[in-house]
Amino acid sequence: MSQLQKGLSLGTKFTLTFGSALLALFPAFAHVTVNPKEAPAGSYAKLTFRVPHGCDGSPTTRLRIQIPEGATSVKPMVHPLWEIETVKKPLETPYESHGRMITETVAEVIWSGGRLPDEFMDEFSISLKLPDRPGETLPIPVVQECEEGIYRWIQVAQPGEDPHDLPEPAPLLKLTGGADAHGQGHGHSHGHSHSHPTP
C-alpha cells in the first residue's frame, strides 16, 4: 500500500470515527431543552427553552409551553417578531399577593406569528415561581408547530426506562433544596383567558 493509500485509509477511518461521535452526541442537542437544568424549589427562576431545529426542514411557527402544576407568577419574555398569548386556569387554592387575591394562574404560554428557519436556533424565556417540592423533577411539556409538521416534546421516561431512548422527550427541571423565594421574576402575568388545549 502506498503512502497516499495509507493516508486516505487513515483519513477515512478518522472521518467515520468522528462522524460516529457526532451522531452519538447529536441526539442530546436535537430536542427542545430547558436551561437551567435545576433550580431551588419555591424560588423565582428564569427558564430558557432552546429550539435547535424545525420539523424535518420546515420552519417553526408556533411554540407552546405548558407550565408545571404548582408554579405561579408566570411571565413570558417578549420576543421580537413573535406574538405572546397566555392560557389561564383557576387556582385550587387562591392566595394573597401585594394586597390582592390571586385566583388564577398561567397554564400555558404560546409564542406564534414568527418564523424560525430549520437552519437556525432560537431561545424563548419565561420567569415564574417554582413549586416548593424539593427533590422533584418537573417535566415541562413543549409543543413545537411548524409550517409542515409538529413535534410534541411531552414524553417522560418511566421507571427503568432510559430517557435517551425517547424520540420526543419533555424538557426536565430538577427542584433542589428550598429557597427563600427571593430573586428575579417578581410580578404576575396578565394574559387572555382561554380553555387549556391538550398537546
What function would you assign to each model-found segment?
Residues S2-F18:
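Bacterial N-terminal signal peptides that target proteins for export
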Residues L25-P27:
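N-terminal signal peptide c-region/cleavage motif recognized by signal peptidases
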Residues E108-E136:
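Low-complexity, intrinsically disordered segments enriched in Ser/Thr together with acidic residues
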Residues F29-V51:
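N-terminal edge beta-strand
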Residues G178-P199:
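Histidine-centered metal-binding segments
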Residues Y44-W82:
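Low-complexity, serine/threonine/proline/glycine-rich extracellular segments that form mucin-like
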Residues G149-P167:
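Beta-sandwich strand segments
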Residues P90-D118:
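Extracellular adhesion/glycan-binding regions together with long Ser/Thr-
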